[in-house]
């Protein structure tokens, strides 16, 4: 196996990242894990809960996944004792307080064409999550949309929304968040070349 020091094979890193995302965003109770309102969980409790499910995760591997995750999904506390998902929570326990931020003129949302009729009628809604997630660039939005089917990119007139009283937040990993995006602020972009 040709992996660099402190690097996991891609399938292992992906599996661990997905497990952490599920537990820290959506279902901490499945392993008896307690999250505080800002989403922090004790690392030792997380590792013990995962072990009770018959899976092995040690601190060094956890730290490697956090440090090398391409989407920077996780944050470790300064003292190294706690971990949290940066954004994307659906569990009602977590009510992160992000500072309000001035958005760029345009933001982007990647989705699948099968969702367009609903989006045209209702705009973007957070669904089970606490916020609508927006990307600062087209490339990231395209990658997100591809995960759900035939992708389409929606351009968000973020500055106009902001001027009309909508609040934006930006998570530590650069993902922009807002409560909803009414359809009047959305524009479908031309389909990317395949």
From Swiss-Prot:
Keywords: NAD, Transferase
E.C. designation(s): 2.7.1.-
InterPro entries, per the entry: Ptrans_KptA/Tpt1 (IPR002745), RNA_2'-PTrans_C (IPR042081), RNA_2'-PTrans_KptA (IPR022928), RNA_2'-PTrans_N (IPR042080)
Key word NAD present: yes
Coiled-coil segments on the chain, per record: none
Gene Ontology BP annotations: tRNA splicing, via endonucleolytic cleavage and ligation
A single MF term (Gene Ontology): NAD+ poly-ADP-ribosyltransferase activity
Matching SUPFAM superfamilies: ADP-ribosylation (SSF56399)
Entry keyword annotation includes Secreted: no
Family: Belongs to the KptA/TPT1 family.
Function: Removes the 2'-phosphate from RNA via an intermediate in which the phosphate is ADP-ribosylated by NAD followed by a presumed transesterification to release the RNA and generate ADP-ribose 1''-2''-cyclic phosphate (APPR>P). May function as an ADP-ribosylase.
Protein name listed in UniProt: Probable RNA 2'-phosphotransferase
Organism in which the protein naturally occurs: Burkholderia lata (strain ATCC 17760 / DSM 23089 / LMG 22485 / NCIMB 9086 / R18194 / 383)
Lineage summary: Bacteria, Pseudomonadati, Pseudomonadota, Betaproteobacteria, Burkholderiales
Gene (UniProt): kptA
């Amino acid at each position: 196996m040709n992996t660099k020091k402190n690097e996991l094979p891609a399938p292992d890193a992906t599996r661990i990242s997905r497990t952490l995302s599920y537990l820290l965003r959506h279902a901490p109770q499945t392993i008896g894990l307690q999250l505080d309102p800002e989403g922090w969980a004790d690392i030792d409790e997380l590792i013990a809960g995962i072990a009770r499910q018959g899976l092995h995760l040690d601190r060094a591997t956890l730290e490697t996944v956090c440090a090398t995750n391409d989407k920077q999904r996780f944050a470790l506390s300064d003292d190294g004792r706690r971990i949290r998902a940066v954004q994307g929570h659906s569990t009602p326990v977590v009510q992160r307080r992000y500072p309000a931020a001035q958005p760029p003129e345009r933001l982007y949302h990647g989705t699948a064409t099968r969702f367009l009729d609903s989006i045209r009628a209702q705009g973007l809604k957070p669904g089970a999550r606490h916020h609508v997630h927006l990307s600062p660039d087209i490339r990231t939005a395209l990658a997100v949309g591809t995960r759900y089917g035939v992708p389409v990119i929606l351009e968000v007139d973020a500055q106009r929304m902001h001027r009309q009283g909508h609040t934006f937040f930006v998570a530590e990993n650069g993902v922009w968040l807002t409560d909803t995006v009414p359809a009047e602020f959305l524009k479908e972009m031309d389909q990317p070349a395949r």
